[in-house]
Amino acid sequence: MFLVGSSSHTLHRLRILPLLLLLQTLERGLGRASPAGAPLEDVVIERYHIPRACPREVQMGDFVRYHYNGTFEDGKKFDSSYDRSTLVAIVVGVGRLITGMDRGLMGMCVNERRRLIVPPHLGYGSIGVAGLIPPDATLYFDVVLLDVWNKADTVQSTILLRPPYCPRMVQNSDFVRYHYNGTLLDGTAFDNSYSRGGTYDTYIGSGWLIKGMDQGLLGMCPGEKRKIIIPPFLAYGEKGYGTVIPPQASLVFYVLLLDVHNPKDTVQLETLELPQGCVRRAVAGDFMRYHYNGSLMDGTLFDSSYSRNHTYNTYVGQGYIIPGMDQGLQGACIGERRRITVPPHLAYGENGTGDKIPGSAVLIFDVHVIDFHNPSDPVEIKTLSRPPENCNETSKIGDFIRYHYNCSLLDGTRLFSSHDYEAPQEITLGANKVIEGLDRGLQGMCVGERRQLIVPPHLAHGENGARGVPGSAVLLFEVELVSREDGLPTGYLFVWYQDPSTSLFEDMDLNKDGEVPPEEFSSFIKAQVNEGKGRLMPGQDPDKTISDMFQNQDRNQDGKITAEELKLKSDEDQERVHEEL
């Protein structure tokens, strides 16, 4: 189309005309009707395609971009922007277009299509354009509007979806990761991050983005979706960008914010559940067992200890895990649930790791602390109840004891109980028959006393665990001492309360035949016990103990004991010392 008095192919006019679009009820559209056969007084407008949504209509002073075909009444084409593959980009209502086009574009929506009939006095008048448009020509235009903006425009941000929980909003100097679809105002797609299989990662307010995007992302929450409309002077302006973004184009971005952090961020802690009576908190050097769910800021799960049905076990504050977790686990209580938000510079940095944690990703861990201990921990003993009467004798190494117990993990998981059996547990203290921590915890008890024992794994089943007991697990025992008997010295199966008879063999040889078979030996020992003169090793089968005693005295294993063979253990020990000397 043409400037008045110019040969350039654009529609122009030198003076500003008021908006004169008037409704008409003609079948062809809008405009001022003329009597039949009379010349048109105004532009006739036919809106033959109106988009469902029209958030904005063209007003005087707006900048528009549109395509058109121009023909005469007989259908002969005199001009077309399509033929030049170039949109018309111009300001409406300031005299740069012929008056008829200025009026015909007013009130138009993006993607609307109109047919305009422009009478000569609103087109090129009685002069026309030499060689192209004859004098007094009525002009027919088919127009589609692709873009509209104004110099007074700002970035328009519309929240499409905002999560109910917003831990933080984007601010200048933050680093963000987001997905986007980018289109022109008419819906033509020019770019999207999804096709590249990765987010767009950048700093905000540092000049790395077009100005409108810098502004449009401010205030967003992780997981939020926004529609951001950017006028060209806050985008790529008069030059456009490559072949995909034309000059003076408004841009529309549909953005999903996945992540936001600031290089100055520290680890953020949120206590979700704190058990009552927290008497100890984890410190650097402790060994901890915990469950966790690890997710990205948008909620995408990247790892979980629950899926492996096994806690994560590690030292805290020793560099075995990412720095953010090392920091975030310190100060936790056993049984506590806490949320640990770790910025990327305290996690896996800009490179990420594997195929589930992208570069520059903020990580969120929902942690349940099962237990922790320190390699220097002793058995922790707490008396729950003690008999009211005086307790003159307490359990010690070598004692034979009977006791009841319940054993669980610190999270309450039940492991074992003596109450599942018909009788209490029986052991000789110090005989290495139970875990070391339990053995220690049972020492110094009164009969009838109840205790709580917390046993660290290095005094229990260690890092490998045992059947039903996880590796590196701290164990909780509730024990009750039922009975206690003095034990025998190491290596002894039987002891006398007083010095034995000087005629011991003769006393054993019941039939006086000079030898003692198993039956006589057993009868003699049992009689000593029944008469209160001596006692067998407690906690053992008496017959088995007596049989072992007989085997020890039957030196030549001929099934009988002679006077030469019979020796007290104290005499044997003395002979051994003499031989060694």
Curated annotation (Swiss-Prot):
One biological process term in Gene Ontology: collagen fibril organization
GO CC term, one of those recorded: endoplasmic reticulum lumen
Basic and acidic residues bias: start-end ranges: 555-581
Residues carrying a glycan: 69, 181, 293, 309, 351, 392, 406
Highest taxon listed in the record's lineage: Eukaryota
Presence of the UniProt keyword Cell membrane in the record: no
EC number: 5.2.1.8
Domain PPIase FKBP-type stretches: 61-149, 173-261, 285-373, 398-485
Classification via Pfam families: EF-hand_5, FKBP_C
Function: PPIases accelerate the folding of proteins during protein synthesis.
Stated name of the protein: Peptidyl-prolyl cis-trans isomerase FKBP10
Phylogenetic lineage: Eukaryota, Metazoa, Chordata, Craniata, Vertebrata
